[in-house]
Amino acid sequence: RVTRVDGLFSEVSLKYRWVNQNPFGSIFWAVQGMAAELSTAVFLMFNIRKSKQAVSMLVLNNQAVFKKKAKGLVKFHCTQGAEAADAVNNAIVTGQAVTLKLKSVGTDASGDIVSEFEFEWSLKKKSS
């Protein structure tokens, strides 16, 4: 669930539940990845919609590091909204594919980092 977003910061919250658990009593890694991806994608979607242009988005690559079991409430944060806005604008202005890397950090209720994700996005203005 997107819980906060502005031009620079986004937050997506994820609660440990039966449906997203793994056999080890924590949040399944792929569910964490979906929340992390959304925390980066929300900037791109917002700026594309604001531009009123058709722009395609594609994840080219992603990397993840898991530091602690994800239990309870986990919040994924991305603070690269300005970079995302610039990339969308460059894709529209140049008509060329633009790539950028956006990072999302997941923290638990104690503030400890449970996982970090980096997504490499490709943006390209669609031809009319």
PLM regions with names:
Residues 43-82:
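Hydrophobic beta-strand-centered segment that forms part of the acyl-chain substrate-binding groove
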Residues 23-31, 65, 69, 95:
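Residues at secondary-structure transition points
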Residues 70-71, 81-128:
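HotDog/MaoC-like acyl-thioester-processing domains
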Residues 19-41, 54:
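Hot-dog-fold acyl-thioester-processing enzymes
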Residues 14-16, 66, 80, 123:
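Hydrophobic residues in beta-strands and at strand termini
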Residues 1-2, 60-66, 87-89:
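Short structured motifs
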Residues 1-27:
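Catalytic strand-loop segment that frames the active site of acyl-thioester-processing enzymes
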Residues 11-13, 63, 75-79, 101-103, ...:
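Beta-strand secondary-structure signal
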